[in-house]
From Swiss-Prot:
It comes from Candida dubliniensis (strain CD36 / ATCC MYA-646 / CBS 7987 / NCPF 3949 / NRRL Y-17841) (Yeast). Residues 165-209 form a coiled coil. Its main location: nucleus. Residues 249-263 have a biased composition (Basic and acidic residues). Belongs to the RRP36 family. The keyword Cell cycle does not apply. One of its GO terms (biological process) is maturation of SSU-rRNA from tricistronic rRNA transcript (SSU-rRNA, 5.8S rRNA, LSU-rRNA). Residues 81-93 have a biased composition (Acidic residues). Component of the 90S pre-ribosome involved in the maturation of rRNAs. Required for early cleavages of the pre-RNAs in the 40S ribosomal subunit maturation pathway. Associates with 90S and pre-40S pre-ribosomal particles. This is rRNA biogenesis protein RRP36. Keywords: Coiled coil, Nucleus, Ribonucleoprotein, Ribosome biogenesis, rRNA processing. Residues 1-20, 26-137, 247-285 are annotated as: Disordered. The gene is RRP36. One of its GO terms (cellular component) is nucleolus.
């Protein structure tokens, strides 16, 4: 007749019962190493993870003097991996991929790269736009690698765009003047800004065309006079002379109101320069 399993009622606290379970498992592990029955498996399955963890740490402390350091490291690593893993998950263990990138210990530390791959000459710096994004929508006709761009030739080739710009300016002005259009304040302000930028662009293009015409005409006159023998050698203008000639030509081509505005800006600029020269800092008493 087989003996029945005696179960004693637990009248201890939770800490004391876990300590008793710990001592019981330690004594039983020392006595019955290698022999494991079904009843032992059932009893072990009822023990909490906290008791198992304390048993593992106590075993490690007792066997530190008898085992080499490599064995200790393996035991500690296996126990940490076991108790750090999620105990509630019933699925298979996750596979760690070998292609995982190493994370930096510090964000200011230099980035690490494998020595097995060749390093590219052009590197992407974090925080700055990559070279591929910068050169994705660039026009190769204006690329510096193909030489310096000829602005005069480009202006002649794309002179037809001025007509489209004038039409766009006229349509914007009519849109702003028309009171039937129910435009918000934000939309009206945005149209005004676009109109102002288009007008300023047209003015800069006109000034550039005027400068190119004046300088080209001056060069032609010098070369013609040199060919006719009036001048021993052609005279090429200095920067200061160019500035004076261009300024005079701009003033002649301006309307009276534009001329007054330009003179007012120049006067304010000169006064500001004089005030900056006369400024002084008060002495500290």
């Amino acid at each position: 007749m087989s003996r029945g399993k005696t179960i004693r009622p637990s009248y201890y606290d939770e800490d004391e019962s876990s300590q008793d379970e710990l001592e019981y498992t330690l004594n039983k592990g020392r006595s019955n190493i290698g022999s494991e029955s079904d009843s032992d498996v059932d009893e072990m399955s009822k023990i909490s993870f906290g008791a198992l963890n304390r048993a593992q740490t106590k075993l490690n402390k007792n066997n530190q003097k008898h085992k080499p350091s490599s064995w200790k490291e393996n035991i500690n690593n296996s126990s940490e991996e076991f108790f750090d893993s999620d105990s509630d998950s019933d699925g298979p263990p996750e596979e760690t991929s070998s292609k995982d990138t190493k994370k930096k210990k510090n964000k200011h530390a230099p980035s690490e790269s494998s020595s097995k791959r060749p390093v590219s000459r052009i590197r992407d710096i974090p925080g700055l736009p990559s070279r591929k994004q910068q050169t994705l929508h660039t026009d190769i006709r204006f690329d510096a690698a193909y030489g310096k761009a000829d602005l005069i030739k480009a202006r002649k080739d794309y002179a037809f765009l001025d007509e489209y710009r004038k039409q766009e300016i006229a349509s914007m002005e009519s849109l702003l003047k028309d009171k039937k259009n129910k435009l918000n304040d934000d939309e009206r302000e945005e149209i005004k800004l676009q109109l102002q930028s288009l007008k300023s662009r047209m003015d800069t293009l006109k000034n550039r065309d005027l400068e190119n015409n004046i300088l080209s005409n001056y060069k032609k006159q010098q070369m013609e006079s040199f060919k006719e023998g009036k001048v021993n050698k052609p005279y090429f203008l200095k920067r200061s002379d160019k500035r004076k000639i261009l300024q005079k030509a701009k003033f002649d081509s301006m309307k009276p109101k534009q001329r007054e505005k330009a003179m007012e800006r120049k006067r304010k600029k000169r006064l500001g320069k004089e005030f900056r020269q006369l400024e002084f800092r008060p002495t500290n008493r």
